[in-house]
Amino acid sequence: MKWVLTPEEFAHVWATETEVDRPPYPLNMIAETTADTGPEPQRLRSRYARNTDPDLTAAMLLCTRPDATVITVSGQRRAAGEPEQILLFAAVVHQHAVVLIARPEAVTVTGCHARGLGERLVAEIGTAPAGSTAGMREPQRAVLGTGDGHTEGKSTAGASRGAARFRRKLRSPVEGRGFVTVTVAPDNPMSPPTRHRTWLDFTDDGRYLLVTAAELALTPVDDAEFAAQLMRMACIC
């Protein structure tokens, strides 16, 4: 299932079908509503009356379910030298997934099986080879320069060199970067905490995933591993 709507059409359909005024983050950064007067709103109300397309209605309502696992993606990449925003929202309930893809000129609504969600999201983010540098893990305070950076099992000099190497890598130029947030079944008290990842596509190198916690971890990933990590974060088997 796939629908391609203008931002105005999407905003109207979203509000009509879900009774929620604003689209979800990060689509609210691009979708615009029109004034409720004049010919355009009248056209929208006529063409997209409630439940005109039951499949589209079901897709919209799935995105608002309190038991839905939600993945949000916001970032930027360079396409033909020009920066391009990446704004994605995905919701999963059982084996059903819906992906909302926002572009300046259109919002695409797609449905897919939950097992294919990771690959679908990576395809929208854009393909990239795995980075060529081995994975790194260092204390956040050492990398950011806010502590002595001592790590158990490492000498002070070794920890300092590792933190400096990590810092140099993070300062390297990038062609794309973005932020992923995954909230698993928020109405379930047994769900894991919300999870976050940053992807970095370094110029003349490749893609890495960055985990920020007490320790920073930078791991090279290709498309398949990126998709697999998204699926693990969302607890989709």
Task: Give, region by region, the residue ranges found by the protein language model.
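Short, surface-exposed polybasic-aromatic patches that bind anionic ligands, especially phosphate groups
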Residues: 1-237
